[in-house]
C-alpha cells in the first residue's frame, strides 16, 4: 500500500523490538539522537553505531575503508550483541549496507527499512543506483585526496544541508559530518542469498525537497516475499531524523 502518513494510529511493532539504525554517507551515529529516546520510550532497544571512518571511529578513516568494511561493522555488532529479530534501518547510502548485511545474516533480520535510501540489486554499486554519485568521485579524483569525498556544501533554501535548513540544526550537522571514502561508492553489494527475499521491507521517502540530479527508483508494487509494498512519505528533506524525528519514529513503530 502506498500512502502519505503523518500520524499513524495503529502500532504493529512487537512489544519489544530491536532497532539497528545505520547512518548514511558523511554522517555518524549521532544523527539519530532525536529518534533514539522516542523509540526507547516505547519500550524498544536501539543501536546507532558509527561506521568505520565516522564519529568515534573517524581516526580509522583510510583509503581501504569501503562498503565491505561497513557491512562488517554491522554484522560484527549483531553477533557481539547476539541480536535477533532486528529491525534494520538504513538511511541513504546505508541502503547498500543493510542489503549486504541481510545477505550475510538473514536469519537475524526481522525487517528491512530503506529510509530515503539507495535500493540496490545484487552486484550494483552506489554509482549504479544513484548515477550522480560518479560526479562526486570525479571531483575527488581532481583533488589532493582522491580517495575521499568531502561533505556536500550547504545549498540555498529550501535545500539547506541534506535537507536541513534550521540554522542551529545546520551548525550541529556541519560539526558532525566528515569525509566519505570513495571505495564505499565503488564496491558492489552482495545480495544473492535467496533467504533475503522473505524478509519484509518498508520504504520511507522524504519528499519535501529533492535537489536536481537525485533520482529514486520506483518501488515494485509487490515485495520479493510476495506481500504488497509498504511505502511511506514524509514531507521533509533528506535528513528526516533531524527535521521530523517524531513522525519518523511513528513510521518505524507502525
Give the location of each predicted region:
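Conserved HGGG/HGGXW glycine-rich cap/lid loop of the alpha/beta-hydrolase fold
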Residues: 17-58
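Active-site loop/oxyanion-hole signature of alpha/beta-hydrolase fold enzymes
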Residues: 45, 51-87, 103-104, 126-131
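Gly/Ala-rich beta-loop-alpha elbow adjacent to hydrolase catalytic centers
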Residues: 90, 94, 98
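Flexible "cap/lid" loop of the alpha/beta hydrolase fold
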Residues: 103, 108-109, 113-154, 184-185, ...
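Active-site nucleophile elbow and catalytic-triad environment of alpha/beta-hydrolase enzymes
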Residues: 175-194
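Conserved loop-alpha-helix segment in the C-terminal half of the alpha/beta-hydrolase fold
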Residues: 207-235, 239-242
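Post-His helix in hydrolase/transferase enzymes
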Residues: 242-254
Amino acid at each position: 500500500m502506498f500512502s502519505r502518513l503523518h500520524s499513524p494510529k495503529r502500532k504493529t511493532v512487537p512489544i519489544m523490538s530491536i532497532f539497528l539504525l545505520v547512518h548514511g554517507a558523511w554522517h555518524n551515529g549521532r544523527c539519530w539522537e532525536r529518534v533514539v529516546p522516542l523509540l526507547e520510550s516505547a519500550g524498544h532497544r536501539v543501536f546507532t553505531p558509527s561506521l568505520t571512518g565516522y564519529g568515534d571511529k573517524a581516526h580509522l578513516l583510510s583509503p581501504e575503508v569501503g562498503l565491505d568494511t561497513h557491512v562488517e561493522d554491522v554484522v560484527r555488532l549483531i553477533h557481539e550483541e547476539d541480536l535477533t529479530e532486528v529491525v534494520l534501518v538504513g538511511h541513504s547510502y546505508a541502503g547498500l549496507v543493510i542489503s549486504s548485511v541481510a545477505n550475510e545474516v538473514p536469519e537475524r533480520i526481522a525487517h528491512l527499512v530503506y529510509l530515503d535510501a539507495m535500493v540496490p540489486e545484487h552486484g550494483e554499486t552506489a554509482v549504479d543506483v544513484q548515477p550522480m554519485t560518479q560526479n562526486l568521485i570525479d571531483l575527488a579524483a581532481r583533488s589532493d585526496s582522491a580517495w575521499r569525498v568531502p561533505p556536500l556544501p550547504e545549498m540555498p533554501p529550501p535545500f539547506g544541508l541534506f535537507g536541513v535548513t534550521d540554522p542551529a540544526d545546520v551548525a550541529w550537522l556541519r560539526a558532525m559530518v566528515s569525509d566519505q571514502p570513495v571505495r564505499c561508492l565503488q564496491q558492489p553489494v552482495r545480495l544473492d542469498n535467496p533467504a533475503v527475499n522473505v524478509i519484509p521491507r518498508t520504504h520511507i521517502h522524504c519528499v519535501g525537497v529533492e535537489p536536481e540530479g537525485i533520482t529514486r527508483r520506483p518501488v515494485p508494487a509487490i515485495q520479493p516475499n510476495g506481500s504488497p509494498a509498504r511505502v511511506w512519505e514524509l514531507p521533509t528533506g533528506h535528513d528526516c531524523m533531524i527535521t521530523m524525528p517524531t513522525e519518523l519514529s511513528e513510521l518505524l513503530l507502525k
